[in-house]
Amino acid sequence: MAHNHNHDHNHEHQHEVITLVDENGNETLFEILLTIDGREEFGKNYVLLVPAGAEEDEQGEIEIQAYSFTENADGTEGDLQPIPEDSDAEWDMIEEVFNSFLDEE
């Protein structure tokens, strides 16, 4: 999912940072761009992430990763799961919420 990042950069963003560990044990920092409560419709929550310190490409876009997540009871860790590519209803909901988020920025 690419994001055309056209909004005012003269304000500070206070994003939480999380660490993702891949299957090889490599750690990568990501900023939490947006969380979405999808429990009522899909029974899970979603998170949109951008690599920490990511820069826009030539087209002014930044790659955004979307996951469903289940938070541990203590709120410090949780499990991220890829969203199935064929789950059109989930992707439509995420895109709708994300576009509303961009409109508010």
UniProtKB/Swiss-Prot annotation:
Coiled-coil spans in chain: none
Tree of life domain: Bacteria
PANTHER family given in the database record: UPF0473 PROTEIN CBO2561/CLC_2432 (PTHR40066), UPF0473 PROTEIN CBO2561_CLC_2432 (PTHR40066:SF1)
Database matches in HAMAP family: UPF0473 (MF_01448)
Family as reported in the entry's similarity comment: Belongs to the UPF0473 family.
Protein name, entry field: UPF0473 protein SAG2089
Lineage start: Bacteria, Bacillati, Bacillota, Bacilli, Lactobacillales
